[in-house]
Each structure stands twice: as C-alpha cells, then as structure tokens.
C-alpha cells in the first residue's frame, strides 16, 4: 500500500485573527503538523471540533475542486470561515495528484447537476451505474457515487460519508476503501462520527477532542466508547 501526501503543516503564526472561527480553535493554534503514515486516515471529533474544516482546508490546499451549495442570505457572515487552507502546506511524496472531495451537504446539488449534464449526454450516467442518481434514494445514490469514483490514482477526501448510509452500506463503503487503498493508487482522508467506519483496519485516527491533535487507538475514540456504553446498557 502507498500514499501520496505524507503530512501537512499548519502555520498559526500566519493566522489573520485569533478571535474568529476557525482560527480561534485551540486545535489549530496548538497543532503544527499532521503526519499521514497510512493510506487511510480518519478525523474524529465532536460537532464544532474542526475536523470537517481541516478536511476541507487540506483538500483546497491540494488544489481539489469542491462543489459549493447555493448559499442564501445569512444573518451573520464570518469572513474567515473558509480561509484556513491559505495557511496549510501539503507535503507531496511524488508530486501533486488529482482527487475529489465528497461532502454529504453538497452531494444533493451534485446529483442535480449530473442530471442536467445527462439530459444532453446520457453517457454521463454510465459512470455511475447507468441510472440517474436523482431516481435513487439518498443512500443508494451515494453508494453509486462511491463505487464509481475511487478507481483512479489520487487522493480522496470524504466528509461524514456515513450520512444516509445503512450499516450494510457502511460496510460496503469500507470494502471499497480497502480495495482501492490496498491497490496502491488511492489515499483517503475521512472525517466521521461513525464507529463502524472508524474500525477500518490499519487506519490512523486523529482525535479532535483534545489539543494538539494526536493519533489515538480505535477503542479510545469517543464514538466507540459512547456506542459501546449505550449497547451494554440496553
């Protein structure tokens, strides 16, 4: 198995503010470097801990396009919200590679855009199993996307892919990740709350529940502890 980026460096001395998110989070002020020693790395942490924010920042620093949802007017706008990537350096092993970013929040927009493309070029759907993603359930369309997208050499970012997936589908996603990472062409960095996905064998898990960030064993993750306690109490 191989991987394409060996680590990233954060530059807190360059941050434009220490009062606004995400630059006010201790994990981003106290963490200088993350090492990626395995083809699959997970970011685990509570809501608001910064895991999805860092995932997106690394993807942008890798020059990977991220689909953007249409944003309606907001009561309060944080001008620093999407700037973290400007202060992240990526350490490539053999030069920059392409990849993709999956976000559950923006996947619905992607499905609709794909349908627009398919109206003029139905062949677009062959890549995703030959059926419109809009005619399938959310979970089914996500699995069609996952089956199609990771066979090429690259680095792949997934933000909470467990959304809308059944336990069986999560196990299938783990199989997809395992096959493509073991083939040596794909590296995955995944933000998740799922104790099922976090159980992926041979992965590194960064915990965002303490600062600075550090790699922890699976059984020390909060999702594992919480689900285990819940099931024992039943």
Residue spans for each PLM region:
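N-terminal pre-Walker A segment at the start of P-loop NTPase domains
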Residues: 1-32, 37
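The conserved Walker
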Residues: 46-47
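Conserved D-loop beta-strand region of ABC ATPase nucleotide-binding domains
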Residues: 54, 159, 190-191
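Conserved P-loop NTPase mechanochemical-coupling segment
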Residues: 111-136
């Amino acid at each position: 198995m191989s991987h394409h980026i060996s680590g990233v460096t954060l530059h807190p001395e360059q941050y434009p503010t220490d009062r606004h998110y995400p630059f006010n989070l201790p994990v981003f002020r106290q963490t200088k470097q993350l090492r990626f020693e395995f083809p699959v790395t997970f970011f685990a942490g509570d809501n608001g801990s910064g895991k999805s924010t860092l995932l997106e920042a690394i993807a942008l620093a890798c020059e990977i396009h991220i689909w953007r949802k249409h944003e309606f007017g907001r009561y309060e706008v944080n001008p620093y919200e999407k700037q973290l990537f400007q202060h992240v350096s990526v350490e490539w092993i053999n030069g920059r590679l392409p990849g993709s970013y999956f976000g559950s929040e923006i996947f619905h927009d992607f499905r609709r855009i794909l349908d627009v493309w398919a109206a003029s070029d139905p062949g677009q759907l062959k890549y995703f199993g030959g059926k419109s993603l809009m005619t399938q359930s959310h979970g089914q369309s996500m699995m069609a996307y996952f089956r199609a997208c990771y066979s090429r050499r690259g680095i792949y970012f997934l933000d909470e892919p467990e959304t809308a997936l059944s336990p069986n589908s999560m196990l299938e996603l783990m199989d997809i990740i395992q096959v493509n990472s073991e083939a040596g062409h794909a590296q995955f960095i995944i933000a998740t709350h799922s104790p099922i996905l976090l159980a992926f064998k041979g992965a590194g898990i960064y915990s965002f529940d303490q600062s600075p960030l550090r790699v922890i064993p699976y059984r020390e993750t909060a999702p594992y502890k919480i689900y285990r306690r819940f099931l024992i109490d039943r």
